[in-house]
């Protein structure tokens, strides 16, 4: 491993610890597109994620400071999720991933 790679390994591992896994980037992508979403809207946007996994991923993203969770009413409880400033700072990375996928022949919508 060359010294440039070695010097970037820790920041790379840290970033992966925040956004790694099957669903976190997709959640960040959806929130970046829609600005604010309720739990049910996120679930409909990602029909193959289980409720347990979506709840766990949202909690992790909130704990890591990448999303905000806001209670908009108490009876019945209504919660909205949005990107934090820290989460929005990842959006250029997400956009570049989309561009890369299109350039590699991925599906266009």
UniProtKB/Swiss-Prot annotation:
GO terms for molecular function: DNA binding. The keyword Membrane does not apply. Transmembrane segments: none annotated. This is Uncharacterized HTH-type transcriptional regulator YdzF. PANTHER family: TRANSCRIPTIONAL REGULATOR, TRANSCRIPTIONAL REGULATOR, MARR FAMILY. It comes from Bacillus subtilis (strain 168). It holds the Pfam family HxlR. Residues 10-109 form the HTH hxlR-type domain. Keywords: DNA-binding, Transcription, Transcription regulation. The keyword Iron does not apply.
